[in-house]
Amino acid sequence: MEPWTLGLTNMFMARKDEMDATVAWLKEFEAGYDSGFADQGIDVLLTPVTGSPAVKLGEQAPTVAYDTLYDRVVTFAAFTAPMNVAGAASMSVPLSWSPAGLPIGAMFSGKRGDDQLLFELALELEAARPWAGRLPGIVAT
């Protein structure tokens, strides 16, 4: 078994008494997500897509030691995971580029079901900062 799979299994088994409380917290987060938009007068949230720059090939392979990989994944997915839990409408658009020419994503998230708002925003962003033709110096085919 790969270190990642074994590590996750061990972590969840060691914390199985916390599962009910964790599931309840996740459901509360999901339920409160949309109301936060109305309460704060927010249409769209803007965050980075990832918590770190693009990783090198193999840095997040399931064969990497569990503790190392866990820290990397938690940092990398810090912004996408909550949106997945909330069931939020989200999109990633490449609005910036690294010195190596790799895209840096900006994540826009709306209320659940607000896909149309995000598609309209994507059209405006693409018109203002076209990205369709931008490719890094090396492209895998």
Residue ranges with predicted function:
Residues 1-34, 43, 48, 52, ...:
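Short helix-loop capping/hinge segments that flank enzyme active sites or metal/cofactor-binding pockets
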Residues 20, 40, 55-77:
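Short, surface-exposed loop/helix-turn segments at secondary-structure junctions
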Residues 53-54, 115:
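Short, acidic Gly/Pro/Ser/Thr-rich loop/turn segments
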Residues 20, 84-141:
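Structural helix-boundary/capping segments
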Residues 37-41, 129:
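Sec/Tat-exported extracytoplasmic proteins
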Residues 32-35, 68-93:
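Small-aliphatic-rich amphipathic alpha-helix that forms the alpha element of a beta-alpha
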